Amino acid sequence: MTKRAVLVASFGTSHLDTLEKTIQPIEWDIAGRMPGRVLRRAFTSGMILRKLEERDGLKIDSVPQALERLAEEGFEDVVVQPTHIMNGEEFDKLMAQAEPYRARFRRLAFGRPLLTTLEDYRDLTAALSEALPEPEADTAHVFMGHGTEHFANAAYCQLSYMFHDQGRPDVLVGTV
């Protein structure tokens, strides 16, 4: 029987309550959609990993550590599913870190970030628009992202455009 796993890779968070309220439910949802696979977690942010270990004694694997552990435990079929929003710097880093492990598995597959195709943008803006109240005069809804020097920062402009294209000029997308 082939040992199969799904490795959910997130940027991470240093707030344990946020981990429980956001990342963990996403991991469980992904695992629920992939029966027969063992769920594992990895964070891509070295700063977050160090902070959690130093402050809380919580050891979470980096992507290379998690893949090494899976290989040592005899897993043959691994899907790496990022929780990243876009194909930016952290996703590029994840892919670069994972590539050397490809030969260690019979199959190493990768999911994609939330916003990869034009259809992804349409789906997300439609879902968020449905969750928002109807537009009102002098009212705006603001979604904030972290922002990046990476060319993927254009994803925020695309998201803003899609909201406006779908009749939601009251929705603003910005970065810090």
Model regions: which residues?
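Active-site-proximal alpha-helix that buttresses catalytic centers in soluble enzyme cores
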Residues: 1-176
